[in-house]
């Protein structure tokens, strides 16, 4: 289907991986305000900060992450921390602990989890959480109860003395939960762990207006001034929400998939990618949303699959979350049997875009007979993808596509 998203966040000697939220349109604005709006703003700010750090570290590579999954996993992890480690982790995620209690933070994530469970049945989405603990350790009941209450996480005993077998079992667990889309999660991580926390998601989105399958053609994609690659280029000719930004050097469109998802495709002018990325913020998204107009557009977007694995340790340290990776780490609310240390924070995500959508009676249609010349917008050079839940404006996925081939 047109939009397939799989994501994993792994934290070794604790780890995590999480998920997309889709809000029931019938959920009241009051409930959203009470449970989630403050959480969403912190999550979006953290998302853009993390995204900008990753882009700076890999200026010539594709980037694709699920920011809310990272926020979710780290917030869950904070339930097992104490003292400075805990305060640093929550503050690094963007939460003002003087204005919002820790209980309210976890209640906000709990509400998000409920929204996932109650999401539109037209979305194909599988998500969940699991904690794998070495059988020689005793998990504190308070931590077990907290992660069950707020994050619907389960605890599974594992023999980490046999790391090869344990890693295969965890890989198999995640693979089965994500319909085979996330495999070999622990591949290449050969340091035995005693605690592995996993949050997983498989998500398949379907365009409300599909691209024209018969119109997909191989075209040039200009990676940079010296590199040109061939890619299958999809076409949608229809009425689309479009903006040629007067403040930033870019054009953009907003598309929807069935359910509650909104996708922004942003095309910076040549050489202006960093300028646009530097300006990404909640205010920019609000301004773009207000400025979009319904326009007749011939939209060309590459049919693309992007995957990546990111070791987030250095990035999180730069963002102020440093205790997790030092001897100062305090995880005494998980177990008192051992001093847990984090060895890695690894995020894995995959994005697939193709043509298919849902045939809807009375829809605008894929092809229009136009009386005026349409806007022609070709995403044939590096571009940005942002996927939000359009009721809560939580940042689901962020991508920078440098080379789709």
From Swiss-Prot:
Q: Which residues form the signal peptide?
A: 1-22
- Transmembrane residues, as ranges? none
Record-linked CDD domains: serpinA6_CBG (cd19554)
Statement: the UniProt record of this protein carries the keyword Glycoprotein: yes
Pfam families attached here?
Serpin (PF00079)
Cell location:
Secreted
One Gene Ontology molecular-function label: steroid binding
Keywords, alphabetical: Glycoprotein, Lipid-binding, Secreted, Signal, Steroid-binding, Transport
Coiled-coil boundaries: none
Which residues bind cortisol per the record? Answer: 286, 393
- SUPFAM superfamilies, per this entry? Serpins
Q: Which Gene3D superfamilies match?
A: Alpha-1-antitrypsin, domain 1, Antithrombin, subunit I, domain 2
**Tissue-level expression:** Expressed by the liver; secreted in plasma.
Record-marked site positions (Conserved cysteine within steroid binding domain): 250
What InterPro entries does the record point to?
Serpin_CS (IPR023795), Serpin_dom (IPR023796), Serpin_fam (IPR000215), Serpin_sf (IPR036186), Serpin_sf_1 (IPR042178), Serpin_sf_2 (IPR042185)
Please give the residues the UniProt entry marks as glycosylated. 26, 31, 96, 260, 330, 369
Of the GO CC terms on this record, one is:
extracellular space
Q: Which PANTHER family match?
A: CORTICOSTEROID-BINDING GLOBULIN (PTHR11461:SF34), SERINE PROTEASE INHIBITOR, SERPIN (PTHR11461)
State what this protein does. Major transport protein for glucocorticoids and progestins in the blood of almost all vertebrate species.
Q: Which family does it belong to?
A: Belongs to the serpin family.
Domain comment from the record reads as follows: Proteolytic cleavage leads to an important conformation change. This reduces the affinity for steroids.
Q: What is the protein named?
A: Corticosteroid-binding globulin
Gene name tied to this protein = SERPINA6
